[in-house]
Amino acid sequence: MKLKTVAAAMLALALSAGAAAAQLAKSLKDQIVGTWDFVVAEVTAPDGKKSFPFGETPKGILIFTADGRFAQIHVASDVPRIASNNRLTGTPEEYAEIMRRSLSVFGTYTVDEANRTVTYNIVSASFPNWEGEAQTRAIDKLTTDEFVNTNRSVAGGRGSASNFYRRVK
């Protein structure tokens, strides 16, 4: 009986090690493909202070396709509703808060395996100033379940911004 238990444990260990090795053998681009839930965006100021532009419990998704396309939506969980219940008749204050607390971007992407970066080639965004830009992010962590990428120099010298994602199962 003990021999069967030991054999089963060894088989399980070998299979999990094999799965880990297979993941390591995949290119970063192959590993990144799929659908990711947005966990949090964390901005770290030069003095080390952290802030969360979409709050600490945001909603969102990031999708990478095998043919090099991406779509990203980040929304704070506490974005206020428009009082009129009509998206075309909100107040300037309502629109300003929505703009501050949400971001949608799509386009194409490339992965630089050697430098461990992903570059987003933005076709369109809810922040139109980004259209046509290529924005590169460091791939800080990429496992079967987690993806973290960081913009090391946020505009205006505000520090760095890291986005944390969990793979959708």
Regions from the PLM with identified roles:
Residues 1-10:
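Bacterial N-terminal signal peptides that target proteins for export
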